[in-house]
A protein has these predicted regions:
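Helix-adjacent hinge/juxtasegments
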Residues: 20-61
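Short, contiguous alpha-helical
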Residues: 1-36, 73-131
Length: 131
């Protein structure tokens, strides 16, 4: 079996795809798209910062196009469809990351992962995290 991408490469790919789709679909909100889709960032704090920046670009693109009533340029009939695609795309890679960790003997239980994923995604603004 051929080895798949590393966890760092998966995070780099997620960041890249976000920025590429913003560039193609709402260029007025575009940020610099990395040259290499799979180039791993060795500094985890820097990778987290990059992921936050690309998430902001997606948010700005969707929000801007909804506010203006304008569709996306290339891929989607409605801006919400871009957000939907990002959710399932990143959910797919979230599963890959959990599998890589498990195969490497570093499995994360649902009890450990829940507060860091579902607990963040489902938290209402201003509410305390569930532990």
């Amino acid at each position: 079996m051929e080895p798949g991408p590393s966890i760092a490469e998966l995070f780099a790919h997620i960041h890249y795809v976000r920025l590429l789709f913003v560039f193609e679909d709402a260029p007025e909100c575009a940020r610099l798209v990395p040259d290499n889709e799979w180039s791993a960032e060795p500094d985890s704090d820097r990778m987290a910062q990059l992921l936050n920046e690309s998430a902001s670009a997606v948010r700005d693109a969707v929000k801007s196009r909804i506010a203006s009533g304008q569709g996306m340029n290339m891929h989607y009939d409605h801006p919400i469809l871009m957000l939907q695609q990002m959710i399932w795309h990143e959910g797919y890679h979230h599963g890959q990351i959990k599998l890589v960790l498990k195969m490497g003997g570093r499995a994360i239980s649902d009890e450990e992962a829940g507060p860091l994923t579902w607990g963040v995604w489902m938290r209402k603004t201003g509410s305390e995290p569930r532990v």
